[in-house]
Curated annotation (Swiss-Prot):
Family assignment from sequence similarity: Belongs to the FLO8 family.
Assigned GO CC terms: cell division site; cytoplasm; nucleus
Name of this protein: Adhesion defective protein 3
Superkingdom classification of source: Eukaryota
Region span, Disordered: 1-32, 69-125, 241-273, 476-523, 572-596, 664-914
Length: 964
């Protein structure tokens, strides 16, 4: 059976009816089982192929019955009657001549090239693959002495061979995908019919190439070779000689290289193929499908694109990767690597590609004209803009005349809308005109280069040239120059378009630093319905942008100038000591000098507003600083004096408790108190000072009262009120420690600022600034002499600041002379820092032996460090003359321990104050319970570092934090 695997008689099935016998089959054959019918066909196969021994053995062992016939050859098997070897006379089988003709027409042959027949005696009846099936050999079928069997399908070679051929065609198509000969015979006929219109089109449009190239035969190497397409291309190409053997059309009908054909001689076609071709109904007279293909059609190194050659075996559900040596494959592994027939989709794709190649070749040989159909819209078909910037007007006119007479081209595209560029296409070739130089943009691209958006509702003037309307890319009378763009005005005209010989650059590209490459920035043609397609609009846009930029620059310069002038005015005002006038309008200083016009154009308002707020805050701080300086120069209130006026009277009127479990007498402000009260050096106030606790006074609705046994509670309303009131000033104590000014009246200034008690001469002296009554602060009085002789236990003064972690009750009472003396002893520090108090910066004062040591144990550190009260009264220094005496004594090396009690921790004996003086100063009043004083309050330079912003913004009853 293996010898017949290469037989491809798929066309036998179509001719099977010609060999069917009309004789009635035997009853045993008609009513027998299919297995018995198969036995009859097997026996028929043995008989027709002269397998006598096999047929006799099979006849003895099988159950078939052969009918007897008198005209049959003598054959009497032992167990069967010999039937007639020929069919009955009434059989409608074809005559041997008809059978021979049909067999030769159907190209039936057996592939039994090497295997001999089992019966070597009848070897002459064997039909080889390369031999012709002649009539003599066909008549030898059935000439053996074996009786023939009566079968329903009686064919010369037997039904078994026919059935196996059909099965093998299906099986090989299922597993191998190899081109078979019937497919190769059928496919060219259909392809030829499909390619006939294409060939006619090619004949009317000759190829411009003067020499034959391989691309004319094989359009795309990635696609499978189509013999009919190649035939049409070669036949319709006038440049190819008819007798060229390398381009012979017979070689285009197979895809097997000659090398493979030589390697597989047994797969070659039979020698009688020309005679079979003559009888085939679908073959042409000049076509030989069995001629080997030349090397130019299929190169030896050609690798087909299997992705485009039909589906793979996996698309049919076949997962078997094995290959089968079958059919017309170039080699045994041709099942996977062979050439597949083109599918209808590939044929359509190849046809479309061929049309594209034709259009492209025509475009390369001829310039693309402007063709217009005479329809209602007069639509623009094709426009080439690549020669408008070179000045070759004469050549363009000649070119338009020559191309306008050719009519509508197949590649012309209709352009309805100027803005719709999705279906537009530029030609691949340019008219015979010079291109603009590199770096120079053609004039028709300037509107796009300038970013101009062109509406699509105004037509462009059209010129009739040679009977064809030509669309002008620019207005006719538009002749711009490099310097004057205003002359490019839109007008309508019917004259021939005159284009400039140069292409002016965009205004932003005057220096040639950057440009748009014409090859990459070529704009597509647009519809005739276009409005304002002129450069002046791009110029107007550029002018508007330039004008806005110049205005923004001018505005920024004006703001900078106004700011500079305002700074100069403020500087002059500060140098003259006058207060600058308040501005009624918007302050130009609030604008930033660094405002970028780009930010203004882009609308970055948040950043500019934030910057303006910062500038406004800075100006406000400067104004506050200038006001503070003016207040110091004119005798206005300082922050300490303001707080003195706020708290001195109220605190002086408060009733303070001294120690726990002891009642203090009620002290009214209008009760006369002796000024010569003895000082209580060892009062219980020292203990309360050591304890570091505080008991704030609560205020009832009926009047002034106190609670001697009430412990300190941070949640007390009055404590919160006092803490909030004192918070902004306690935080500023370290900033106020600056050297004392070296002004001659530094002592007077210190008295004013730090709260030194004034005498009557100073209060009544018009030259002293504090003698003038302020509208914010009434004159306070010194309550240091309120200690009556019987008020020993009620003259204690305690610190306001509580030490955390310690218990006890600290009372607020009338200022004690001992504590006051301790506070006043620190005034010597002012004299040490003052240039007028000592000769050298390193000079120190000697301790005063007459002063008692200060309390050391539990004294609050804030009272010693931050409370810098003047101690002039305790040392009998109550006037400027005494201060001068103290200075002279200090210079002479005398005892100055009274002025520097901080050198030793010894308590100083308090000296009674002679009388009660109403004083608005802070330190020496009964309201000086917080110690808001500094030795540098009179320094003018202190105001430069003073944080007025926090002073003005944080002060108030809502301040919740206390700064220790």
């Amino acid at each position: 059976m293996a010898d017949f695997m290469d037989i491809e008689p798929s066309s036998h099935s179509a001719k099977a009816s010609q060999y069917e016998s009309s004789a009635p089959a035997s009853s045993s054959l008609g009513n027998s089982h299919p297995n018995e019918s198969l036995d009859y066909y097997i026996y028929d196969y043995f008989v027709k192929h002269n397998f006598e021994e096999a047929a006799q053995a099979f006849l003895r062992e099988s159950k078939i019955q052969i009918p007897k016939s008198s005209s049959s050859t003598a054959f009497s098997p032992s167990n069967n009657n010999a039937p007639s070897p020929f069919p009955p006379k009434n059989s409608s089988l074809a005559s041997p001549s008809k059978i021979s003709e049909s067999i030769s027409g159907d190209r039936l042959y057996n592939h039994m090239s090497s295997a001999p027949s089992p019966n070597k005696k009848e070897e002459t009846n064997v039909v080889h693959a390369n031999e012709d099936i002649s009539l003599d050999k066909r008549q030898s079928f059935g000439s053996s002495s074996l009786p023939p069997s009566e079968v329903s399908i009686n064919v010369p070679e037997g039904f078994l061979v026919e059935w196996f051929n059909i099965f093998w065609d299906v099986f090989s198509a299922r597993v191998s995908r190899v081109n078979s000969t019937p497919i190769q015979l059928y496919d060219p006929s259909t392809q030829r019919q499909m390619a006939r219109p294409m060939s006619n089109l090619q004949a009317s449009q000759p190829v411009p190439s003067s020499t034959f190239s391989r691309s004319a035969v094989v359009p795309n190497p990635s696609l499978p070779l189509n013999p009919s397409v190649l035939q049409g291309q070669v036949m319709n190409n006038p440049t190819i000689p008819k007798g060229t053997p390398s381009t012979s059309i017979e070689g285009a009908k197979t895809s097997i290289p000659p090398s493979h054909a030589m390697q597989n001689p047994h797969n070659s076609f039979p020698a009688s193929a020309d005679r079979l071709q003559k009888n085939h109904p679908v073959q042409s007279s000049n076509f030989n499908p069995y001629t080997p293909a030349p090397s130019i059609t299929v190169p030896p190194n050609y690798i087909p694109n299997t992705a485009m050659m039909g589906p793979s075996y996996s698309s049919f559900g076949d997962t078997d990767p094995r290959t089968y040596p079958a059919g017309m494959g170039p080699n045994p592994t041709a099942a996977r690597n062979g050439f597949y027939p083109p599918t209808p989709a590939q044929i359509h794709q190849l046809k479309a590609q061929q049309q594209h190649l034709q259009r492209q070749s025509k475009q390369m040989s001829e310039p693309a004209p402007i063709n217009m159909k005479s329809n209602k819209d007069q639509q623009l078909q094709y426009v080439d803009f690549r020669g408008v910037g070179s000045g070759a007007d004469l050549q363009k006119q000649q070119w338009n005349k020559s191309t306008s007479a050719e009519g509508l081209q197949p590649n012309g595209l209709v352009m309805r809308n100027f803005g719709d560029v999705r279906h537009q296409k530029l030609p691949t070739s340019s008219p015979p005109s010079q291109h603009p130089p590199v770096g120079q943009i053609p004039s028709q691209y300037l509107p796009y280069q300038a970013g101009l958006k062109v509406p699509g509702n105004t037509p462009i003037p059209v010129k009739q040239v040679g009977g064809m309307p030509l669309q002008s890319p620019l207005p006719v009378s538009m002749k711009p120059s490099a310097d004057d763009h205003s002359r490019a005005t839109p007008t309508r005209s019917v004259e021939a378009p005159t284009l400039p010989s140069y292409a002016p650059r965009h205004p932003t590209q005057a220096n040639g630093s950057r440009y748009m490459n014409p090859s990459t920035s070529r704009m597509t043609p647009q519809s005739p319905y276009m409005q304002n397609y002129y450069r002046p609009h791009a110029q107007m846009q550029d002018q508007n942008n330039m004008m806005s930029y110049m205005l923004s620059q001018q505005k920024a310069m004006e703001i900078a100038k106004s700011r500079e002038m305002a700074i100069q005015r403020n500087t002059q005002t500060l140098s003259s000591g006058n207060q600058p006038p308040q501005q009624s309008g918007p302050n130009p200083n609030e604008f930033s000098m660094s405002m970028d016009p780009a930010n203004m154009q882009q609308g970055n308002h948040a950043l500019s507003d934030y910057h303006m707020q910062l500038m406004l805050l800075e100006e406000q701080n400067k104004k506050r600083l200038m006001m503070a300086r003016q207040e110091q120069g004119t005798g206005s209130l300082s922050p300490q004096s303001y707080m003195n006026s706020r708290y001195s009277v109220d605190v002086g009127k408060e009733h303070m408790s001294m120690i726990p479990n002891q009642t203090a007498p009620m002290i009214q402000p209008n009760v006369p108190v002796s000024a010569n009260s003895p000082a209580q050096a060892n009062t219980p106030a020292a203990d309360s000072t050591k304890s570091g606790t505080i008991q704030p006074t609560n205020r009832n609705g009926e009047g002034l009262s106190y609670s001697p046994h009430q412990q300190f509670s941070p949640s007390a309303p009055q404590a919160e009120k006092l803490s909030r009131s004192m918070s902004p000033f306690v935080s500023q104590q370290q900033q106020l420690n600056q050297p004392v000014s070296n002004k001659p009246d530094g002592l007077t200034q210190n008295k004013e600022v730090t709260g030194m008690p004034l005498n009557k001469e100073e209060l009544t002296n018009p030259a002293f600034p504090q003698s003038r009554t302020s509208w914010m602060m009434p004159q306070s009085f010194d309550t240091s002499s309120l200690n009556a002789p019987g008020a020993k236990d009620s003259s204690s003064f305690s610190s306001l600041h509580a030490q955390p972690g310690k218990s006890g009750i600290a009372t607020m009472g009338v200022a004690d002379n001992t504590i006051r003396t301790t506070e006043r002893s620190t005034f010597s520090e002012i004299m040490k820092d003052s240039p007028s108090a000592h000769a050298s910066p390193g000079a120190k004062t000697s301790p005063n032996a007459s002063r008692a040591p200060e309390p050391t144990g539990g004294t609050n550190s804030i009272s010693q460090d931050t409370t810098q009260s003047l101690q002039m009264q305790s040392n009998s220094v109550n006037s400027s003359s005494m201060v001068d005496a103290s200075k002279s004594k200090e210079k002479s090396g005398g005892d100055t321990s009274a002025l520097d009690s901080n050198a030793k921790n010894e308590p100083t004996a308090a000296k009674p104050i002679s009388k009660l003086e109403d004083d608005a100063l802070f330190n020496d009043s009964a309201g000086n319970a917080f110690g808001f004083s500094s030795k540098t309050d009179s320094n003018v330079e202190m105001l430069n570092d003073f944080d007025f912003e926090s002073f003005l913004n944080d002060a108030g009853a809502d301040s919740a934090s206390v700064y220790y």
